[in-house]
């Protein structure tokens, strides 16, 4: 194997392992966030049974669905997240070679910053093309509030993918893909671009104290998450459309979804679950730092 291939494989492994560990740890927060985002578009959650907020959600989930339901959709998320994050990190470095080749970060700051934004955004969009059906399934499984058996919309990951494919074809598994690409470019651009730029400005980036790295990563994930959150809400709502027919369809398309959420629920609705997203972002910050630490030993 060439040095480039070995480097690519190390990036893939380090990113994937770090992501799988952190995602499982924050899975309960992730599910709360998803339920708050999509409950208005769920056939299972009637208006009188909607969650009032994070605390209400955390209290009611174990009572109504059991404690283990906090991890509903987590298998799909781990399977999805391993290649997603691994591909993001691996492609990020490849795109950095394209966008940042020959750029001096000290004398060409804005070009360096723009190159980091471009490489982060392109990496996120590229990896999304490969794993979107898994992201779709994770969302639908997390949104499934049935207690067990017949009450559940889907029995598991495979059942979800098969049912939606039979009902809507491949299009159903990619529902909300366009707005996802828009959101992922914004999120990844900030996530990687600002993080790498900030680390690059440090006197000795390779030997930065882990606490400083974590603080930078924490700030980056919070800002990136809030900036792209409305796009995430719209894409999750669009995912809830798959498998529906006729009058059950709430939104005719992405623009209609944006318009109806703003008109019927107000601007705040785009940010439902955003606070839990910031908490979840601690896991994302941990991934960035853990990835750098793992790479030191590989």
From Swiss-Prot:
A motif (Nucleotide carrier signature motif) lies at residues 235-240. ADP binds at residues 80, 92, 235. InterPro entries: ADT_euk_type (IPR002113), Mit_carrier (IPR002067), Mitochondrial_sb/sol_carrier (IPR018108), Mt_carrier_dom_sf (IPR023395). The modification N6-methyllysine is found at residues 52, 147. The modification N6,N6-dimethyllysine is found at residue 52. The modification Phosphoserine is found at residue 7. Present in kidney, brain, heart, liver and skeletal muscle. GO terms for molecular function: adenine nucleotide transmembrane transporter activity; ATP:ADP antiporter activity; oxidative phosphorylation uncoupler activity; proton transmembrane transporter activity; ubiquitin protein ligase binding. Keywords: Acetylation, Antiport, Chromosome partition, Membrane, Methylation, Mitochondrion, Mitochondrion inner membrane, Phosphoprotein, Repeat, Transmembrane, Transmembrane helix, Transport. Residues 235-240 are annotated as: Important for transport activity. PANTHER family: ADP,ATP CARRIER PROTEIN 1-RELATED-RELATED (PTHR45635), ADP_ATP TRANSLOCASE 2 (PTHR45635:SF3). This is ADP/ATP translocase 2. It comes from Rattus norvegicus.
